[in-house]
Amino acid sequence: MLDNKPFKDIEKQAKHIIDLLNQEGARKKAIALKPFVPAEPLPQTASKFGGRADLPAGESAPTNEKGEPLGMIAQINCAELPENDLYPATGLLQFWMDPNDEECLWGFDYENPTSQKNFRVIYYETLGEPNPDAPFPNVDWDEGGWPIGGFDCESGPLELEYGMTFEVREQGVTASGYDYYDVFGAKWDETYPDEKLPEAHENPYKNQARREALYELTEPFESEEEYSHVGGYPFFVQNDPREEFKELRGHTVNLLTIVSESENEENEDEEIEIMWGDAGAANWLITPEALAARDFTNVAFEWSCG
């Protein structure tokens, strides 16, 4: 039994399971999105965090259920991305949220994560003449604020727009997803049949012993590296909504993850402020079929903090 084995031996076994999962297809390509403070206002067509959206001439910002304009939290100019098989090759993908949500949730509906009443994901296939009157997010800093930038009592709002640079990376299997423990546990029992973990139960209370064993096995290998990205795996600070909402388990594509950042590691003199509550993160997920059809009406959006 595992109780009688040295920890180093158990750790080697756990590492072997993770390596097996990655070899069998768990590794995913991701594109890291690195924010930077632009020296001058970015073009409306540029990839960016926050800022002024590139809306077609005559087009207005999407609105919440009260008819109030949403604020753009991110815009991806697909042609600027490194070569990938996730995003369209051209066009703009925009992510909008409610800057004046009375519950300070910025449009996240924890009872229905795909409800786009107060958030929106919009894809423009072609770039035409932009609407010069496209607004910046209209943020009520006395209430919920906004993840991008901040507010100084003397100078007012700080940067509400950051540029993006891109870096192709690869992510191995991560503990963040709802099915991680199930996948790891099944592979462990298959690989080490004489050292099986406590039996799995649908009842979460009866499953506690197995969950605790899985946590102890995998905790040493959890990555502490957090970065905004498209593709790869989402990063859930708290719970993966797909665990509760089984109808979302087909949402396997990570359309976008934005994490909290309070500094620029490459330039200490450049202040970056992206903050989801208390150092949280946000994720947008989609099904492969909807993405292939360029249908962004059924995207799951969630954010949470520590």
List each model region and its residues.
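Preference for intrinsically disordered or flexible, low-complexity segments
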Residues: 1-306
